[in-house]
């Protein structure tokens, strides 16, 4: 077969006393390291006891057998392909199908809702619990209040854990895109946000606290840019609130104005769109069951603007922290069902704080990451020196195409050379992988790199699929929490509504 002739396996530098030439790859050797979805899991585990599930990323497609071979280990994967390289058709969509066959959970970032439209109905029919956060059209799908988890922890007395979540929120919203020229303003705004969230928690008697409450506090605390001394005298009794806010409260006027300006600019996203503000005021989404029942969460975002990308990064971080917390408190310290982060356009998302540590620790908790990037430069711009740590934690690399010269040279060097010093695959050849055939260069674990055809989604669903209609987001009535009694009660508006319904029933009973 043509594929067999083009596989490149033996890099320059071998210590073996044989000719150091590129040799054609043996497909059977590669297949032995991967998993055939047609095999039983018990048979698979006889060969590799570490494999707990047979779901994974497709790394080889044998068209003659109509068989897809996947990496079912706990390895993370990096997929590189510029716009129009068929990343979605060749990798994302087939990956979701492979994971669904193995009944694994997924969290999927989805520009344009293209992935949702193609797979959500299939997942629903397969018994998946499908939920959607729709930042493209916030009137559809679920609601998500980023402050819900830390407020719940705060109310239940788990203050230290609540502070960790608040700190993550402040860092992701204020410091995800540092100026790198003078980071003082971002860090000061982060301290301000931390203090205001904590103050909102301390003062509130509502069941939920949202960013709307935080923005109202900011307006009250700094009327006309000047601190409200009366509010400050009460707030500073809490030592943590005091330390968080004092840098802004006691700053010189010009400095305070700049801090507030930075804060307002970063928080503008929570104020200018009514549907989004309402979506973030309440919480109808839960990730707690992801590791215990097969679930899929779609994060739909606009691809034409990056306005809401910080919220996607925040959700990814908060969801991960919540899952780690749940895993640590479980008997096995891991999840029964594997959880897969499928992060399309990962390199365009704002920096996720501590991501290198996240991807390092994830495997032991049965969590995998699949990172889709358009270019290496984008990744380096976001994560700087930590980009290399992220790349090195991905055992699988799939290269589709690129015009980024430094990346092409790097990929060519990784593939190795012949004894004469010629690259096994040149920069020129890397730019001419056959798009229509779905050709890709694959680096997988300690296997020699090889070129293969990837399975197109049309080979799996034959381009026939239903579109699952998204439900309209429903407003949840605000409830009050009495901190003295620990009882949650309904708001006055809900009391009135119930009284009207009772009178109506009396009249027509």
Where are the model-predicted features located?
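Pre-P-loop entry segment of helicase/translocase ATPase cores
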Residues: 2-71
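Short intrinsically disordered, low-complexity coil segments enriched in acidic
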Residues: 2-6, 437, 452
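P-loop NTPase motor domains
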Residues: 53-54, 58-64, 68-367, 382, ...
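Short secondary-structure boundary/capping segments
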Residues: 122-125, 146-151, 385-389, 413-418, ...
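Short acidic, gly/pro-rich beta-turn/loop elements at beta-sheet edges
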Residues: 309, 452, 462
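Conserved ATP-driven motor cores of ASCE-family P-loop NTPases powering translocation/secretion/packaging/pilus
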Residues: 359-445
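Short amphipathic beta-strand/extended segments with alternating polar/hydrophobic composition
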Residues: 450-456
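Short, surface-exposed linear segments at secondary-structure transitions and domain or protein termini
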Residues: 459-469
């Amino acid at each position: 077969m043509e594929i067999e002739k083009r596989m490149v396996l033996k890099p320059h530098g071998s210590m073996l006393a044989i000719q150091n030439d590129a040799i054609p790859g043996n497909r059977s050797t590669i297949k032995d390291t991967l998993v055939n979805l047609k095999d039983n899991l018990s048979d698979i585990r006889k060969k590799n006891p570490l494999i707990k599930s047979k779901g994974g990323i497709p790394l080889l497609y044998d068209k003659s057998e109509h068989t897809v071979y996947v990496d079912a280990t706990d390895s993370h994967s990096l997929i590189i392909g510029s716009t129009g390289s068929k990343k979605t058709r060749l990798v994302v969509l087939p990956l979701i199908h492979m994971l669904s066959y193995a009944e694994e959970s997924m969290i999927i970032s989805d520009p344009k809702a293209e992935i949702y439209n193609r797979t959500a109905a299939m997942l629903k029919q397969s018994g998946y619990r499908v939920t959607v956060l729709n930042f493209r059209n916030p009137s559809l799908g679920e609601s998500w209040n980023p402050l819900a988890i830390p407020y719940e922890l705060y109310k239940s007395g788990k203050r230290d854990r609540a502070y960790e979540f608040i700190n993550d929120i402040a860092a992701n919203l204020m410091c995800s895109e540092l100026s790198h020229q003078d980071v003082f303003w971002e860090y000061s705004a982060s301290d301000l946000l931390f203090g205001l969230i904590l103050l909102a928690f301390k003062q509130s008697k509502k069941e939920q606290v949202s960013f709307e409450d935080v923005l109202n506090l900011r307006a009250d605390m700094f009327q006309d840019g000047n601190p409200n001394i009366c509010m400050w005298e009460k707030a500073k009794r809490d030592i943590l609130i005091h330390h968080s806010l004092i840098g802004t409260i006691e700053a010189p006027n010009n400095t305070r104005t700049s801090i507030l300006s930075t804060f307002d600019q970063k928080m503008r996203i929570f104020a200018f769109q009514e549907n989004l503000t309402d979506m973030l005021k309440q919480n109808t989404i839960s990730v707690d069951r992801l590791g215990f029942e097969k679930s899929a969460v779609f994060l739909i975002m606009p691809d034409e603007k990056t306005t809401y990308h910080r919220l996607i990064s925040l959700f990814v971080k908060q969801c991960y922290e919540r899952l780690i917390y749940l895993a640590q408190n479980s008997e096995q310290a891991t999840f029964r069902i594997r959880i897969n982060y499928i992060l399309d356009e990962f390199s365009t998302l704002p920096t996720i704080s501590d991501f290198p540590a996240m991807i390092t620790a994830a495997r032991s908790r049965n969590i995998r990451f699949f990172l889709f990037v358009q270019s290496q430069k984008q990744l380096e711009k976001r994560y700087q020196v930590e980009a290399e740590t992220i790349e090195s934690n991905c055992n699988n690399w799939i290269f589709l195409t690129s015009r980024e010269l430094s990346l092409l040279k790097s990929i060519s060097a990784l593939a190795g050379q012949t004894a004469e010093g010629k690259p096994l695959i040149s920069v020129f050849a890397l730019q001419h992988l056959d798009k229509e055939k779905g050709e890709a260069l694959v680096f997988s674990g300690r296997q020699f790199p090889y070129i293969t055809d990837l399975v197109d989604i049309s080979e799996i669903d034959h381009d026939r699929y239903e579109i699952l209609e998204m439900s309209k987001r429903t407003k949840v009535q605000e409830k009050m929490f009495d901190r003295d009694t620990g009882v949650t009660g309904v708001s006055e508006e809900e009391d009135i509504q119930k009284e009207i319904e009772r009178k109506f029933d009396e009249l027509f009973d």
